[in-house]
């Protein structure tokens, strides 16, 4: 599968007409500085799609990008292309922004996943493979486990930045992450920088 023709549509901070669209949504969520923007750019093949910033916590809205998922293995050409929204949620957990702003973004993120307004199909929760799961990651996982079945969406843990770890460290850290999860939640090791693991993540998104 490939993601093609991705382009920015709009940013929202709450209820919006775009949520009434029948297009399914693939959401990307993660702490500030885990490489979320770089990963989305890598998956879409468009390095300038999501603006990366040296200032964590800069994104304060939920950004929608239209895209076409192309299943190159489909025999029926009518089933090859599917229009979706890629949804880039604000990075969370950055300590240097005011507490009030952090809490506002937290509530906006939770609203997106639990309100039932968004037609979410898949959620990619991006973490830093070296840092492992942090407090808000675990809170998000609990939310996704509770509301995913209710609203019909699946989620995966994308353990990013494995290019910064050697093979032994990668194996050790992934095992620790899986132990923390304690159940059958898929974990895909990736590198948004080098593209390693990209195809596995795309395969999961296609299911």
Positions of PLM-derived features:
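Conserved G1/Walker A P-loop phosphate-binding module
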Residues: 1-94
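Flexible beta-alpha connector loops of hexameric P-loop NTPases
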Residues: 92-102, 163-166
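Active-site glycine-centered loops adjacent to acidic/histidine catalytic or metal-binding residues
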Residues: 88, 160, 191
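Hydrophobic aliphatic residues
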Residues: 43-47, 113, 205
């Amino acid at each position: 599968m490939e993601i093609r023709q991705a382009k920015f549509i709009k940013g929202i901070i709450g209820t919006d007409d775009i949520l009434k669209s029948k297009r399914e949504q693939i959401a990307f969520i993660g702490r500030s500085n885990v490489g979320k923007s770089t990963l989305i750019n890598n998956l879409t093949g468009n390095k300038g799609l999501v603006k990366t910033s040296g200032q964590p916590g800069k994104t304060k809205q939920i950004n929608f990008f239209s895209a076409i998922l192309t299943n190159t293995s489909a025999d029926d050409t009518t089933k090859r292309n599917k229009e979706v929204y890629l949804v880039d949620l604000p990075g969370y957990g950055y300590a240097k922004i005011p507490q009030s702003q952090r809490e506002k973004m937290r509530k906006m993120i939770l609203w997106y996943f639990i309100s039932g307004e968004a037609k979410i199909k898949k959620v990619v929760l991006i973490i830093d493979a070296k840092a492992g799961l942090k407090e808000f990651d675990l809170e998000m996982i609990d939310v996704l486990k509770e509301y995913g079945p209710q609203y019909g969406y699946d989620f995966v843990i994308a353990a990013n930045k494995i290019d910064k770890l050697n093979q032994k460290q990668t194996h050790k850290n992934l095992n620790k992450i899986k132990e923390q999860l304690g159940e059958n939640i898929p974990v895909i090791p990736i590198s948004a920088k080098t593209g390693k693991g990209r195809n596995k993540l795309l395969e999961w998104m296609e299911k």
